[in-house]
Amino acid sequence: MQCVAQVLWKSDVAKIGSWSDSLGVMPTMTSISSLESLTDRVIGGERITPKEALELYHLPLEELGALANHRRMLARTDAVDGKGNEIVTYIIDRNINYTNICNVYCKFCAFYRTEKEADSYVITLEEMDQKLDELTAVGGIQVLLQGGHHPKLGIDWYLDLLSHMREKYPHVNIHGFSPPEFNHFAEVFKMPLEEVIRRFKEAGLGSIPGGGGEILVDSVRNRIAPLKANSDQWLKVMEIAHGLGLNSSATMMFGHVETVEDRIEHLGRLRRQQDETGGFTAFICWTFQPENTKLRAEPVGSAEYLRMQALSRVFLDNFTNVQSSWVTQGPKIGQVALRYGANDFGSVMMEENVVSKAGANFRLESQEIENLIREAGYTPRRRNNWYELVD
């Protein structure tokens, strides 16, 4: 007798075909899992506890992937007029880093510079216009705007930048400024956090990325980024932003000094926040990229990435969208991830400066993304930040 997860996996194999088999990531069938009652509850759509998540983490990868794929289907059943499980979405945007000057010196970051370094910079309006002209020329509709914690830029610099972008490029959503940046702004501007976020929104900010989350466990954060916003501060920014009508994404960067239990605690904090505010549009996880950083850690492989993405999809039962991280894993693993809980292929990513400095250098055009999605058995569709179809 086979457990239900194995039966689901057999069905997935038939749908996937040979495209992932050639990558060596589709394992052989395993013996009956001792966690059948738990997996049956997962299939039934029940919420799992952190302890149960740890048990599921140790399932054979193909069984966990089958459960994640099933939970993806449950989450997407009513999306896009009932066609949510027939499509995979993506967006055309550009990641623009307005400055690389930063005074928090995260050990996992290869991007930051001090003010005195020759290659430090602060973007000009002319440079921003050039980048946005290039973005709109290829059909781009969003800019991911983030930067270092610059110790001297005042609020007027940011508000002028946002106002300029909104007035000149009104159809481009500004998906900008991570929670640690907002925490930094409140300190530098000497203003209440809510006032800062409100003024940024009034100037043109449309949504907030989930960057800077890393692992929302302070014992971990104190080791990898002791000068950065702590876990409660990160979540507070999101709580305020959601209350002001700004949606955001949520992220996890793993594979450094944290434990599996830390990862699950991180997911638990995101789930509780989503229960309270409902403001997260999607979850994205990726693995630590160690090249050129001060943090020494053995890189985790693609199997571990797929395992954590699958577990995240099962655990985060109140998130509709999970994004594949092809930027760090490569196009083929990004494709396989579509059967491990992901329903979105992320962004064409015209420009990316942070993880590329740490060793991830994958690039894709929109046609390549669409081909990968079709090969996986889905229909590609373009979306905006709110997961509304735009094609």
Tell me the role of every PLM-derived stretch.
Residues 25, 113-251, 256-265, 269-272:
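Conserved Radical SAM active-site core
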Residues 94, 146-155, 218, 291-292, ...:
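Glycine-rich, proline-tolerant flexible connector loops at the mouths of alpha/beta enzymes
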Residues 53-57, 94-95, 147-151, 254-257, ...:
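Conserved short loop/turn motifs at secondary-structure junctions
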Residues 45, 68, 106, 145, ...:
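Conserved, mostly hydrophobic/aromatic
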Residues 2-62, 130, 136, 267, ...:
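Auxiliary Fe-S-binding modules of radical SAM enzymes
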Residues 71, 75, 168-172, 244, ...:
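Helix C-cap/helix->beta junction micro-motif
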Residues 65-116, 120-146:
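N-terminal pre-triad scaffold of radical SAM enzymes
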Residues 88-94, 143, 174-177, 208-210, ...:
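Hydrophobic faces of well-ordered beta-strands that scaffold small-molecule active sites
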